[in-house]
Amino acid sequence: EKLIKGYTEKQWGRPCTERPSFIIKRLPVRLTFDNNYFNALYQGIPVGGYTKMIANMLGDVEVRLNTDYFEHKEELDALAEKVIYTGPIDAYFDYKLGELEYRSVRFETEVLDQPNFQGNAAVNYTDKDTPWTRIIEHKWFEFGKDIDGKDLPKTVISKEYSSEWKLGDEPYYPVNDEKNNELYRKYKNLADKQNKVIFGGRLGEYKYYDMDKVIAAALKAAVSYTHLRAHETKANL
């Protein structure tokens, strides 16, 4: 009741009894001073953050911002023999079988004229009465240092508010209950017939991935496609 029920129902907008067990099991309970969220032996984030990592990965690749894929689908699909789609799978098929359910998140970010707010990168608020689910204090992901290793005199915090998704909102989390999973399986059957498209990620696979798991899945998909492409090339020789 104190640690899980209020937080889970606030985040998902549904009674705990309607959530799959893996959602509840994601919340670790320890009687120690270990403040890690995960139990993995090795944990970390990219130096400089994920934005820097993605920028390094893109390199000289052309990036188009503020471009609706569906408005330019024919043109964009013609640019490559394979398309990797990580948006909502139901949106790809224009919701022809109905809308899947998602949770959305709203952020309120503040710059505080103080060196420390909560002493930790993330603090979750488990009571149901606090409107936000957690507060992120970004500097602690880099141990409170700037790019030159100097202490930062100010701090930036973001409060996260969970809400029900509706068309026009940004979807964040799939609602993996029985009803939605059944609808996803129908969309998956349609997706499997799209030979040109690889569906991936939380939205493309309608799966509540952790970051390490989704990176591993992306690498696996890339390797599988590379092997398939090599096999097709060899067969055509």
Where are these regions (language model features)?
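Alpha-helical elements of Rossmann-like donor-binding domains used by nucleotide-donor carbohydrate transfer enzymes
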Residues: 52, 56, 186, 217-220
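Residues within well-formed alpha-helices
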Residues: 7, 217-221, 234
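Mid-domain catalytic core of redox enzymes
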Residues: 69-190
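A conserved FAD-binding loop/helix module that cradles the flavin
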Residues: 205-222
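Active-site/ligand-binding neighborhood in enzyme catalytic cores
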Residues: 1-82, 86, 91-93
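Short FAD-binding loop at a beta-strand-to-alpha-helix junction that anchors the flavin cofactor
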Residues: 193-206
